[in-house]
Every structure is written in C-alpha cells, then in structure tokens.
C-alpha cells in the first residue's frame, strides 16, 4: 500500500506537565471550514500514521487532526511512566482542544483512542458531535487485556522491515488471516521506525507498559456511565469479528445505550480493524453525513 500523497502540516501543543505533543493537521477546503474537525486518536502502541488512509479520504471535505499521544510517534516521552493512563491522555486532549480553540468535533478512536473519546464526551456533553469507536467499549475482555499485557513494552528490534513485518505476522496472523506481505509491511511501517542504531524498533516509549505492572493500574474508571455523553449523537461502533478485546455482548449492550448507534462487524479481522476496509470507509461517510444533517437540523 502506497503512502497517500495528501499534504498535512505538523502541529504541536503542550501538555499540562510540560510535554511537547504532536499532531498531523490535514486542512479542509475554505468552503468546508464551518464543519467541525475530525480528530483521530490511536490505540495503545500506535500513532498518527495509522490514520493516513482515513485522513486521505476525508481531507478537504473535513479538517482532520491525527494525534500522537504522549510517548508515541513524534510526541515527547513522559517523565513519569504512571502518567500513561487514560485520565492523563484526556487532560492532554483537553489542552489540544483549548490550544486549537475547538469547541465541537467528531472523534475517531481506535481501542485506547475510543476510551479517550468516551471520557471526552462525558466530561463536557455536546462537544463530541459524532464518534467512531473502533473495536472497543466500556468493558474490555480479560483475554485481550492479558495479551496486551504480554506484548506491550517488550522492546524488540529487527534488522530489516521485512523481518519486522514477519514478526508481526507471527504474532497477529491468526486474527488477520487475509493480510498479504504488503499489508504486514504497511502495518510495520506505521507501528515502527528506524532507531538510532539503524535497526527497526517500535515507535513508542517502552515505559507505557509500567501501569500494567501495577495491579489494577490500567483499569482506570468505570466507563459505562461515560456512554451517556454520546447518546445524543450518531455513533459508529466497529468490531473485528475475531476480536479478543471487544465482545459481541458488550457491543450489543452499547447499542441499548446509544439510540443513534450502529454496529459494523468486519469479517476476518481481530483487534483492531484498520478502518481502511471498504465497508468501514462507506460507514464513515454515512456517519459524517449524519453529523452534517444534525448540524443543519440545529440551525433550522
């Protein structure tokens, strides 16, 4: 898969504890500047590059902001590893929203990014005007959490990109059975970087694993009540059919809380769908159409 040739600018903002954090900013055309921006928030070990294809499809029609959470990508690493928890990420996002003077936005959150989305919606109702929750809900399955605890922060490195891609396929091949060599290479180049010694390394601070070493350290707060913040708006719930992190039961329970919620199950994918799947791209277009329709209804 080739890298989209879509221009973006690199933006930076400061966290409350003095970290310089990074985002990619894909602009909207002037005639679409009235629309709320789409903010993409990645998963635990991931970064802004995960949303290249999504941003390429939406840029121009919408402003798209893809963030690197603290300790990932081009954002600074935290001085205190125990700040690698959802409530701190929410504070960081609050600082971004304030710096960019964003009052309303659409949130696309994968895994951890979805948890952050729910928390942002609950702390100030009305500012999240639409959401995509990618393979995550208020309840995380123990098997998936155990798998994450086993691999995060391992600090592996590889001599070539092909070695890195092969390692990913060995670990995740069972939940992405349809991936080609090109797909694995694309995944590797989004998740990893060339390290100082020339070897391929994961593009995150290995210390993000430290909260997982504390019993209950990754648990945070009960997230079921936060769904109320998304109840008034359109929500697309994407679930990988082979996910071990996000169960069918949790997804169905969420639909009972979200009157405008829709569930899309992506076949032959585990945790988490890339959002580049054709059916997901179509569903994102529908979601944003619903956001537009709600805005027009409010103005009428």
Predicted segments, located by residue:
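The conserved beta1-alpha1 loop
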Residues: 39-43, 239
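Conserved serine/cysteine hydrolase catalytic core
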Residues: 194-256
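Conserved hydrolase catalytic core segment
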Residues: 103-142
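Serine-hydrolase catalytic-loop signature spanning alpha/beta hydrolases and amidase-signature enzymes
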Residues: 43-53, 64
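Catalytic histidine-centered segment of alpha/beta-hydrolase-like enzymes
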Residues: 269-278
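Alpha/beta-hydrolase fold catalytic core
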Residues: 1-38, 60-61, 102, 279, ...
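Conserved alpha/beta-hydrolase catalytic His-Asp/Glu region
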Residues: 159-214
């Amino acid at each position: 898969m080739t890298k989209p040739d879509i221009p973006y600018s690199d933006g930076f903002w400061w966290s409350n504890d003095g970290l310089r954090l990074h985002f990619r900013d894909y602009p909207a055309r002037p005639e679409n500047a009235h629309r709320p921006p789409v903010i993409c928030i990645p998963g635990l070990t991931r970064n802004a590059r995960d949303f290249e294809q999504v941003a390429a499809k939406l840029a121009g029609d919408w402003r798209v902001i893809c963030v690197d959470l603290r300790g990932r990508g081009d954002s600074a690493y935290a001085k205190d590893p125990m700040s690698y928890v959802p409530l701190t990420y929410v504070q960081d996002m609050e600082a971004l929203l304030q710096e960019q003077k964003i009052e309303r936005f659409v949130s696309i959150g994968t895994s951890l990014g979805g948890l952050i989305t729910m928390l942002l919606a609950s702390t100030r109702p009305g500012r999240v005007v639409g959401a995509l929750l990618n393979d995550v809900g208020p309840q995380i399955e123990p098997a998936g959490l155990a798998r994450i605890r086993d691999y995060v922060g391992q600090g592996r490195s590889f001599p070539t990109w092909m070695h890195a891609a092969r390692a990913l396929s060995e670990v995740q091949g069972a939940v992405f059975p349809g991936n080609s060599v090109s797909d694995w290479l694309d995944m590797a180049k989004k998740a990893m970087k060339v390290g100082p010694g020339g070897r391929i390394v994961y593009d995150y601070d290995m210390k993000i694993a430290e909260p997982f070493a504390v019993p209950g350290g990754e648990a945070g707060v009960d997230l079921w009540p936060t769904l109320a913040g998304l109840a008034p708006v359109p929500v697309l719930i994407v679930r990988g059919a082979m996910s071990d992190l996000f169960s069918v039961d949790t997804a169905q329970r969420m639909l009972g809380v979200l009157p405008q919620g829709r569930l899309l199950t992506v076949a032959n994918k585990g945790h988490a769908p890339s959002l580049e799947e054709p059916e997901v791209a179509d569903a994102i277009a529908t979601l944003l159409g619903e956001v537009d329709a709600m805005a027009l209804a409010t103005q009428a």
